[in-house]
Amino acid sequence: MPKELTNTHKPWFVYLIECQDYSIYTGITVNVEKRYAAHLSGKGARYTRIRPPLKLLAVIEFADRATAASTEYTIKQWTAKQKRAFAAQHAVI
């Protein structure tokens, strides 16, 4: 099958984590389960090493890294109240 007809691109995800101090961490990854496990084990971002995760609030899928990164940047500019409202619409079940 020609390469252009096969879908070899993995989706990217933006995820929001509520931390123990009730702040919200936003990140991107291709594997949410693996990345969340890294945050839980203290091997994730410095932010979540200092403020350990309480729960995964939301996960949003994107077709490519550029769109996910752009969305991550936008979300990081929001207030905690805006992030919580967004997370409520994209909650992890």
Residue ranges and their predicted role:
Residues 1-44, 50-53, 58-59, 66-81, ...:
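GIY-YIG nuclease catalytic motif and its immediate N-terminal context
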